[in-house]
Amino acid sequence: MKKMVLAVCCCAALLGGCGDRYEAKSGLTPYKEEIFAMDTYMNVCAYGEQSQKAVEAASAEIQRLDELLSVTGESGDVYQLNQLGQRQVEADTLAVISRAVEVSKETDGLFDCTITPVMKLWGFRDGNFRVPSSEELAEQLAKVDGSKVHMEGNTVTLLDGVTV
């Protein structure tokens, strides 16, 4: 959990801090790296003596979380959880799923981490985009229910075929 919090803080600080104005005022040259993770391009940037080390550490953590939380990466917790329906997961995965379930409750289901079947239907997972029929949507929406995600210790259980 501490690693995840650190990664998020680093990313927020790094992603927002690479403007030309800071470089001009400080006289420091940034170390920058562009990565692709979590289905998006990211620019990681840092200034100072340890900038390269900081950027490499942040990039490695982003890649680790991407693999761990990926719906399609077969070695990750989320992929395996979706395949098995129940699984012991790493602390970072548990924290993300736990918070997602909380947000689902707080928003009365407007945000729901079990939307995966609908995402697949529209082609967001494999890039084969299409507009599904009303019948297909109704069938897949029946599989969306954040209340069917249960956690006990570090074990997550997905009931009735829901996926995250």
What positions do the PLM features span?
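A contiguous, well-ordered beta/alpha segment that forms the leading edge of an enzyme domain
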Residues: V5-L6, C11-V164
